[in-house]
A protein has these predicted regions:
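Preference for short coil/turn "hinge" residues that link or interrupt alpha-helices
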Residues: 14, 45-48, 77
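Residue-level detector of alpha-helical recognition elements and their boundaries
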Residues: 28-29, 44, 91
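Enriched for short, Lys/Arg-rich terminal
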Residues: 2-4, 19, 59-112
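General structural signal for secondary-structure boundaries
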Residues: 9-11, 40-41, 91-98
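Arg/Lys-rich, positively charged N-terminal/basic patches that mediate binding to nucleic acids
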Residues: 1-38, 112
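Generic structural motif
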Residues: 3-9, 49-52, 78
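A short, surface-exposed loop/turn module that caps and links secondary-structure elements
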Residues: 38-66
Length: 112
């Protein structure tokens, strides 16, 4: 049985995704969340579905792609409790390089 890495959703990100994600991306969201929960992926630093990687210019914030082509993404952070905290879902228009820092500053209450 696989080891599970705890996911924390204090901000209702999964609920928000259910409301705003187009139907065709909801299954992909489940696959990404399952991959993020798989501790083996974290040990091997291999995330084939979500392409989890650090956000450039943001301290301790990581990005997981729900769908890379469409631009739907999740921002997550590793907490002091060694769990992965879901911070927010980014719509395709929100991940543009020029607006990334502005958006994160506006929503800083969602980040650890």
């Amino acid at each position: 049985m696989a080891e599970i890495k705890g996911l924390v959703d204090d901000h209702g990100i999964i609920y928000e995704c259910n409301k705003i994600l187009p139907e065709k991306y909801k299954i992909k969201l489940i696959e990404v969340l399952a991959e993020l929960e798989d501790n083996e992926c974290h040990k091997s630093h291999s995330f084939p579905k979500s392409q989890l990687h650090k956000v450039t210019g943001a301290d301790k914030v990581y990005r997981a792609d729900i769908d890379k082509i469409s631009g739907w993404r999740l921002h997550v952070q590793y907490g002091e409790d060694k769990k992965l905290h879901l911070c927010e879902v980014l719509e395709p228009v929100e991940h543009d390089r020029g607006t990334k820092k502005k958006i994160m500053k506006q929503k800083k209450g969602k980040y650890l």
